[in-house]
From Swiss-Prot:
Species annotation: Streptococcus pyogenes serotype M1
Keywords: Amino-acid biosynthesis, Arginine biosynthesis, ATP-binding, Glutamine amidotransferase, Ligase, Nucleotide-binding, Pyrimidine biosynthesis
Protein name listed in UniProt: Carbamoyl phosphate synthase small chain
Top enzyme category: ligase
Gene name linked to the record: carA
Enzyme Commission designation: 6.3.5.5
Metabolic or biological pathway, per its Swiss-Prot or TrEMBL entry: Amino-acid biosynthesis; L-arginine biosynthesis; carbamoyl phosphate from bicarbonate: step 1/1; Pyrimidine metabolism; UMP biosynthesis via de novo pathway; (S)-dihydroorotate from bicarbonate: step 1/3
Single Gene Ontology BP annotation: L-arginine biosynthetic process
Function in brief: Small subunit of the glutamine-dependent carbamoyl phosphate synthetase (CPSase). CPSase catalyzes the formation of carbamoyl phosphate from the ammonia moiety of glutamine, carbonate, and phosphate donated by ATP, constituting the first step of 2 biosynthetic pathways, one leading to arginine and/or urea and the other to pyrimidine nucleotides. The small subunit (glutamine amidotransferase) binds and cleaves glutamine to supply the large subunit with the substrate ammonia.
Matches recorded under Pfam families: CPSase_sm_chain, GATase
Reaction(s) catalysed (UniProt annotation): hydrogencarbonate + L-glutamine + 2 ATP + H2O = carbamoyl phosphate + L-glutamate + 2 ADP + phosphate + 2 H(+)
């Protein structure tokens, strides 16, 4: 059987068995520490352009089902596992992980020492990597990898091109799609909200023309500093309607208010990150997927830190002191992961009610 190679930017080479699509790819290699939820992770558009390493030793044992998609068209570049289950056993299963990746054109590699790989990423940071069959010249692959420039328009690639509705009978929410997870839509639909999903480059004027009760800024891939148009939109809407941001939305909200962001060494990607709510001391276990963070020292006086990561003190939430607006770095929608923080969707809707009363 043909072997598949995983070549890192620092020259490290791993050899494993191929599964999924039979193509060569290059992307940023990252790792996810979740024990389950591989379908949700692979279909999360926040992984656009990235080669996704799962640290859990066995992936694929319950297959792929019709319910757990976070997007219909996954855009991660590749999947790296220690062992892939070629058989899948679950009453909801539609197909195996191998079959799914073949259909979606995503290559996988198994038989990799993912512990050793994760240690390299933790020590040296995320880096470029190439997955290719071992019939290719290794030196040629290394030269190609070194010369590859990863794209920066990752959000443009995954955002909706046109606005579309998700009808409901409740509050009107404009949801900006920076790489939207379906679970965010589901959380608002549970609460009967009337949602309009809009492209990433919508203007403040266009948002306000939709007469929304609130603005939701979704998750998404890449560097938030690559979206100056989104910052202008947030500044134009802020103070006129309540705002809630998640993940990329959190970073954009912070940037729009004068804070700075920085690239993390290896990021937070997993489903068991403990976060403290500073006001109450409450601890929530959260789902996270981000490679950038808001710099605490850069926060203006108008923003207050509401949540922080217990382990490394990363800013995990902020709130505006003057306007009805807040954001969190983690995913209260979970999918996958714990639902400890799903109450934040209710707090956003309560904020809308309060704003209506005070702005009359």
């Amino acid at each position: 059987m043909t072997k598949r190679l995983l070549i890192l930017e620092d020259g490290t080479i791993f050899e494993g068995e191929p599964f999924g699509a039979d193509i060569d790819v290059t992307g940023e290699i990252v790792f996810n520490t979740g024990m389950t939820g591989y379908q949700e992770s692979i279909t999360d558009q926040s992984y656009n352009g990235q080669i996704l390493t799962f640290t859990y030793p066995l992936i694929g044992n319950y297959g792929i089902n019709r319910d757990d998609y976070e997007s219909i068209s996954p855009t991660c570049k590749g999947v790296v596992v220690s062992e892939v289950s070629r058989l899948a056993s679950n009453w909801r299963k539609q197909m195996t992980l191998d079959a799914f990746l073949k259909i979606k054109g995503i290559p996988g590699i198994s038989g990799i020492d993912t512990r050793a790989l994760t240690k390299i990423i933790r020590q040296h940071g995320t880096m470029k990597a190439t997955m290719a069959d071992d019939g290719d010249s290794i030196q040629h692959l290394k030269d190609q990898l070194r010369a590859t420039v990863l794209p920066t328009n990752t959000i443009e690639q995954v955002s909706t091109k046109t606005a579309y509705p998700a009808p409901g009978i409740g509050k009107n929410i404009v949801l900006v799609d920076f790489g939207l997870k379906h679970s965010i839509l589901r959380e608002f639909s549970k609460r009967q909200c009337n949602i309009t999903v809009v492209p990433f480059n919508i203007t403040a004027e266009e948002v306000l023309q939709l007469n929304p009760d609130g603005l939701m800024l979704s998750n998404g891939p890449g560097n938030p500093e690559d979206l100056p148009e989104a910052l202008d939109m947030i500044r134009g809407v802020q103070g006129k309607i309540p705002i809630f941001g998640i993940c990329m939305g959190h970073q954009l909200f912070s940037l729009a208010n004068g804070a700075k962001t920085c690239k993390m060494t290896f990021g937070h990607r997993g489903f068991n990150h403990a976060v403290r709510e500073i006001a109450t001391g409450r601890i929530d276990f959260t789902s996270q997927n981000h490679g950038y963070a808001v710099e605490r020292s850069s926060l203006p006086d108008t923003l207050m830190v509401t949540h922080e990561d217990i382990n490394d003190k990363t800013v995990e939430g902020v709130k505006h002191r003057d306007f009805p607006a807040f954001s969190v770095q983690f995913h209260p929608d979970a999918a996958p992961g714990p639902h400890d923080a799903s109450y934040l969707f209710d707090e956003f809707l309560e904020m809308i009610d309060s704003w209506r009363c005070t702005s009359k």
